[in-house]
């Protein structure tokens, strides 16, 4: 038997079955870096049309997690697929470097700026820390197989970038969008600074829920508004609030002008509440006996006076549209210093804007009753005062969603402070942004409604911060008028030049007289820094417009769904404020990473999946396959079990590639490829199937439908290849003569297929695709990533794909019949069987034209096709209209091909072989036409 084994063309390859990705991937990464593969990709696409995916900068703090991996791998898939499509698709990664998280980490080591360390030294430590974090994250991103200009990234703390932030501010000032104001802003007491909306998280919090009586100064003027002319007695407008600490700042009670309000007679006093809320309000107050004495619109009470519940001052009734009847009383406590709606109402009625709370969250010393008390602890004291004055109508605790600082996880407050704002309406910026939103392609399309809603409802953007580590606002304001210096734009450019040379310390170290001369004594130098969302938001200016390898606007921005209120928003706002257009053509959004049950990943919950552990255990390509396998438009689940399933899918893909490579061990494409006209029909079918599939895959890449690519490739490996083509060609590949047309036809097809297949994989399974590419025979390019989509297909005559689809279906039915026969113990392998297929007039010609090669379709020792009319009685008809009869072969088994044939032993020189094998090991080359 051994001598016949040596006559077979058994597969052989150096491409290992075991991937060992955690070992091979770092070696390949080092090889890419040593060869400068990214630079060579760029060189190969010089002069091609550009495609710009602009990277949203991750924060330079801490190791990467699975959300980072999801984002960067998705971007990498896009960049690589666009490169294969012929685009020059550079990828310039970025990092966001200023701001509080870095300050906090540095504070842990050296203390607060200005106490144990000077602000200048503190900023140097922040810069040093951010640089160290970039080094860590750069290595971790590269380990994921993400190609890019990693050693020329954009970094928001680079001097030239900081200078451009300042210049961007100048452009927005020039266009009339900056204004200063004393307005309520999100304020974190722990940070001691204003917060951007994107820095606010909403979490559940237990708060007091109280109703407070505001008594009418002159009940008669209220009662006269009701047609019933009720008798005069005390009258109360009750308010409901969950922030009792804001009551010292109350300046009005707000009603809705068009809501119907009811006059409730409760015996000793009247109450005016929204008609829709009467029942719930009276129940809350424990008042069961009452009557309604009249109705009136809210607008009729405008300017009437009420008594503040614990101060001597009187406050007016005012009107506004934000009042609802969803909860409360329909009468809204209004403190202009502590809320954006309250502030706007206050502005329209010129209410006093008095802020009783200091930056540290404590009431100022001049605040009657509550001086020095922290607002976070003041509620109990305020409730006691209200109760003592008999104005506390109801009190309970509720659990509700409340804004918290994203970093400290502590409840934040609204606090009126002097700040700088990008006005949304001063120069019609809001409408201009909305107009630009309509021009952008939003994927998924709900992104458009989401960001539109945010823009329509957002207040002015507070861009000033009271922090040490950030880009300064290089402004001078007049000490008396508080107006900006008349030469502000010129001064900003001079400061930008200084920062470009020496960094942000150039401003903080600057003596005002250096720029203003004698004028300096009349001006205050602003010490605020800018919101970090402005830092990253102007990357379209500092990066896209200042890097010659990039273009503005970008083709794509691609980030998580939280960036509709973050980077998408700040980028859009600044771009429109600076030059009137959106910075992107398409915005893609992916969901959050969650566990298998859709819950947020958390170390405390025990469902956290460590990225480094996944990569070290499974390899980056398994993680990349996980990314591609999910529909990123929704939340993306990850767990050890999900990764293991992807590892199983990976093995099927790898084994498909390995089979193709192993059967090309003696194939030289330069000399062994055969003419397309000589290809067997099955090989032509396989090539045509690949060409059609490639069109589908390219379309899916262009539409960013990566999960469809995963499904198509997996189906191709499992169905088209694994259970059909690769199974059928084994006999021909192994048993026919080495240089026969039949075998070289198969190898020619496999050569084209493995090259195309590997390029399909490359954007997703980058390391594995490169490994396959280096094993494919022939003179291939240095790296697969320099290639285009495969286009060296043989010119194939028309192949009837429907016929082969039908043959595939019949084969599946035959396999079922063979398995049933095997289960009954009548046969062992399929080669121990002979099959007769009885088919109708539609299917029969497709089978009979294969002639003797029909048995190779079923991988049985004998097969024939007959009209269905000849089918034995009782033989079941399958869904595809055929009947199948399986019998055990009575013939001897060929020692070489294992087929059981009547002619085994007829050749005396090779008594163990069938005549087909005798011919294949001698001068006779078996001829095949179809399979």
Swiss-Prot record:
Cellular localization per UniProt: Cytoplasm
Notes concerning its domains: IleRS has two distinct active sites: one for aminoacylation and one for editing. The misactivated valine is translocated from the active site to the editing site, which sterically excludes the correctly activated isoleucine. The single editing site contains two valyl binding pockets, one specific for each substrate (Val-AMP or Val-tRNA(Ile)).
Presence of keyword Kinase: no
Cofactor(s) for this UniProt protein: Zn(2+)
One GO cellular component term noted in the UniProt record for this chain: cytosol
Gene expressing this chain: ileS
EC number: 6.1.1.5
Signal peptide: none
Residue positions of motif 'HIGH' region: 58-68
Catalytic activity: tRNA(Ile) + L-isoleucine + ATP = L-isoleucyl-tRNA(Ile) + AMP + diphosphate
Gene3D superfamilies named among the record's database cross-references: 1.10.730.20, HUPs, Ile-tRNA synthetase CP2 domain-like, Valyl/Leucyl/Isoleucyl-tRNA synthetase, editing domain
Motif 'KMSKS' region location, chain numbering: 600-604
NCBIfam families according to UniProt: ileS
Keyword Ligase carried by entry: yes
Cofactor notes: Binds 1 zinc ion per subunit.
Amino acids binding ATP: 603
InterPro entries membership: aa-tRNA-synth_I_CS, aa-tRNA-synth_Ia, Anticodon_Ile_BEm, Ile-tRNA-ligase, Ile-tRNA-ligase_type1, Ile-tRNA_ligase, M/V/L/I-tRNA-synth_anticd-bd, Rossmann-like_a/b/a_fold
Subunit structure: Monomer.
PROSITE patterns: AA_TRNA_LIGASE_I
Main location as per UniProt: cytoplasm
Protein name: Isoleucine--tRNA ligase
Binding site for L-isoleucyl-5'-AMP: 559
GO biological process, one term: isoleucyl-tRNA aminoacylation
Lineage summary: Bacteria, Pseudomonadati, Pseudomonadota, Gammaproteobacteria, Legionellales
Family affiliation: Belongs to the class-I aminoacyl-tRNA synthetase family. IleS type 1 subfamily.
Protein residues bound to Zn(2+): 894, 897, 914, 917
């Amino acid at each position: 038997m051994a001598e016949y084994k040596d006559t077979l063309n058994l597969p052989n390859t150096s491409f290992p079955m075991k991937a060992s990705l955690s070992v091979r991937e770092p070696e390949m990464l080092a090889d890419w870096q040593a060869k400068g593969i990214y630079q060579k990709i760029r060189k190969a696409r010089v002069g091609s049309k550009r495609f710009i995916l602009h990277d949203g900068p991750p924060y330079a703090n801490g190791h990467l997690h699975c959300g980072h991996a999801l984002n960067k791998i998705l971007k990498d898939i896009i960049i690589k697929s666009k490169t294969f499509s012929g685009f020059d698709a550079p990828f310039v990664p970025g990092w966001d470097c200023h701001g509080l998280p870095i300050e906090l980490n540095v504070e842990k080591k050296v203390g607060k700026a200005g106490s144990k360390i000077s602000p200048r030294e503190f900023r140097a430590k922040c810069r040093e820390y951010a640089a160290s974090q970039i080094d860590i994250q750069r290595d971790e991103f590269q380990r994921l197989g993400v190609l890019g200009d990693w050693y020329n990234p954009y970094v928001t703390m680079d001097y030239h970038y900081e200078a451009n932030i300042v210049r961007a501010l100048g452009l927005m000032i020039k266009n009339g969008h900056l204004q200063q104001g004393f307005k309520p802003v999100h304020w974190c007491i722990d940070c001691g600074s204003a917060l951007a909306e994107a820095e606010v998280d909403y979490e559940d919090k237990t708060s007091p829920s109280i109703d407070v009586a505001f008594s009418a100064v002159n009940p008669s003027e209220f009662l006269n508004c009701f047609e019933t002319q009720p008798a005069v007695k005390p009258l109360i407008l009750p308010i409901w609030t969950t922030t009792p600490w804001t009551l010292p700042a109350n300046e009005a009670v707000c009603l809705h002008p068009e809501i119907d309000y009811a006059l409730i007679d409760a015996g000793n006093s009247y109450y005016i509440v929204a008609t829709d809320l009467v029942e719930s309000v009276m129940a809350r107050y424990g008042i069961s006996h009452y009557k309604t004495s009249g109705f009136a619109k809210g607008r009729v009470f405008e300017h009437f006076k009420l008594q503040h519940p614990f101060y001597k001052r009187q406050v007016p009734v005012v009107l506004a549209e934000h009042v609802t009847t969803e909860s409360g009383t329909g009468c809204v406590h209004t403190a202009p210093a502590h809320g954006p709606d309250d502030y706007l109402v206050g502005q329209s009625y010129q209410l006093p804007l008095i802020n009783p709370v200091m930056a540290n969250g404590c009431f100022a010393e001049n605040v009657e009753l509550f001086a020095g008390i922290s607002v976070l602890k003041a509620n109990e004291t305020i409730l006691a005062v209200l109760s003592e004055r008999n104005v506390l109508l109801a009190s309970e605790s509720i659990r509700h969603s409340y804004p918290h600082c994203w970093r400290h996880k502590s409840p934040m407050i609204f606090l009126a402070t002097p700040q700088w704002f990008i006005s949304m309406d001063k120069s019609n910026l809001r409408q201009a942004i909305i107009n630009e939103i309509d021009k952008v392609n939003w994927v998924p399309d709900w992104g458009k409604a989401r960001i539109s809603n945010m823009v329509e409802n957002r207040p002015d953007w507070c861009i000033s911060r009271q922090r040490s580590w950030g880009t300064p606002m290089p402004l001078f304001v007049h000490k008396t008028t508080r107006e900006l210096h008349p030469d502000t734009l010129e001064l900003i450019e001079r400061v930008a030049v200084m920062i470009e040379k020496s960094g942000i310390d150039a401003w903080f170290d600057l003596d005002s007289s250096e720029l203003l001369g004698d004028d300096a004594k009349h001006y205050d130098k602003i010490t605020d820094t800018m919101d970090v969302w402005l830092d990253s938001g102007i990357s379209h200016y500092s990066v896209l417009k200042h890097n010659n390898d990039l273009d503005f606007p970008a083709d794509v921005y691609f980030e998580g769904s939280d960036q509709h209120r973050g980077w998408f928003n700040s980028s859009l706002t600044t771009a429109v404020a600076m030059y009137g257009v959106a910075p992107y053509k398409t915005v893609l959004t992916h969901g959050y990473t969650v566990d298998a049950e859709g819950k947020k990943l958390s170390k405390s919950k025990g469902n956290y999946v460590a990225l480094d552990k996944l990569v070290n255990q499974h390899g980056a390509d398994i993680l990349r396959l996980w990314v591609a396998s999910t529909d990123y438009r929704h939340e993306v689940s990850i767990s050890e079990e999900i990764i293991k399933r992807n590892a199983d899918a990976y093995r099927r893909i790898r084994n498909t590639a390995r089979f193709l490579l192993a059967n090309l061990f003696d194939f030289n494409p330069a000399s062994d490829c055969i003419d397309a006209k000589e290809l067997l029909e099955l090989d032509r079918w396989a090539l045509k199937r690949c060409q059609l599939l490639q069109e589908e895959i390219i379309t899916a890449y262009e539409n960013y439908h990566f999960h469809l690519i995963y499904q198509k490739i997996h189906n191709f490996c499992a169905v088209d290849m694994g259970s059909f083509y690769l199974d059928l060609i084994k006999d021909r590949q192994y048993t026919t003569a080495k240089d026969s047309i039949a075998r070289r036809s198969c190898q020619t097809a496999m050569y084209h297929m493995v090259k195309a297949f590997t390029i399909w994989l490359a954007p997703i399974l980058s390391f594995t695709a490169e490994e396959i590419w280096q094993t494919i025979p022939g003179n291939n390019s240095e790296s697969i990533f320099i290639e285009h989509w495969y286009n060296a297909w043989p010119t194939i005559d028309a192949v009837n794909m429907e016929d082969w689809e039908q043959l595939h279906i019949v084969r599946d039915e035959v396999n079922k019949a063979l398995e049933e026969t095997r289960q009954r113990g009548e046969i062992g392998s399929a080669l121990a069987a002979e099959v007769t297929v009885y088919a109708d007039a539609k299917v029969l010609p497709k089978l009979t034209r294969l002639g003797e090669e029909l048995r190779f379709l079923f991988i049985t020792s004998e097969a024939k096709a007959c009209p269905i009319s000849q089918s034995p009685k009782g033989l079941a008809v399958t869904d595809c209209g055929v009947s199948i009869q399986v019998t055990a072969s009575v013939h001897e088994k060929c020692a070489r091909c294992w087929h059981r044939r009547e002619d085994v032993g007829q050749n005396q020189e090779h008594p163990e072989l069938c005549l087909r094998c005798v011919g294949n090991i001698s001068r006779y080359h078996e001829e095949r036409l179809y399979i």
